[in-house]
């Protein structure tokens, strides 16, 4: 995969990534046992490189400049057909059927669900959303710890109500996919 003309190869030594991309802006823990090296200083070249035992083991990008075996961001999603049987690769399309992002992760299930991993996931989601928003010329979001704390407490209160039913979450707007879609589409 290339991002902004810079190559990322699975199984490459981490020193190659550091020489090519520089020091990551952040290193996040994952539930899969490896670390994400997060490059988010320029959302038009946003990428995350999974590193374990000093080797590249995973990658993700939704950069507008990515290229993977001749497939580029914005190409017709049908170009990914050759990889349908390869569970290590996941390709994501935008609402118009164009290739939007690629994930290479040979691990299917994570085992670590610690507080630090949950925090990392929230930061990664914010970066992925901001990269998408940047690609579509929308204002990026800035993390607000006070708002995060208030939202967390509000969701805990909601979930602890005695009359809680599983479908109430979806009906009330707490459905994570609905929230994600609203974040991507809002100005």
Indicate residue ranges for each PLM-predicted region.
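Functional surface patches built around histidine and acidic residues
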Residues: 1-187
């Amino acid at each position: 995969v290339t991002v902004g003309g810079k190559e990322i190869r699975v199984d490459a030594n981490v020193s190659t990534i550091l020489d090519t991309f520089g020091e990551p802006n952040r290193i996040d823990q994952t539930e899969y046992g490896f670390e994400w090296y997060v490059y988010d200083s320029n959302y038009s070249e946003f990428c995350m490189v999974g590193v374990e035992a000093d080797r590249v083991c995973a990658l993700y990008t939704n950069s507008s400049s990515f290229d993977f075996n001749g497939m580029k961001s914005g190409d017709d999603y049908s170009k990914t057909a050759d990889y349908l049987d390869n569970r290590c690769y996941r390709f994501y399309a935008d609402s118009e059927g164009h290739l939007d992002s690629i994930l290479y992760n040979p691990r299917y299930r994570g085992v670590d669900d610690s507080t630090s991993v949950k925090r990392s996931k929230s930061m990664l989601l914010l970066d992925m959303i901001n990269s998408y928003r940047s690609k579509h010329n929308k204002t990026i979001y800035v993390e607000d710890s006070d708002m995060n704390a208030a939202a967390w407490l509000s969701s805990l209160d909601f979930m602890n109500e005695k009359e809680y039913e599983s479908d109430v979450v979806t009906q009330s707007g707490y459905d994570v996919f609905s929230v994600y879609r609203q974040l991507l589409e809002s100005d």
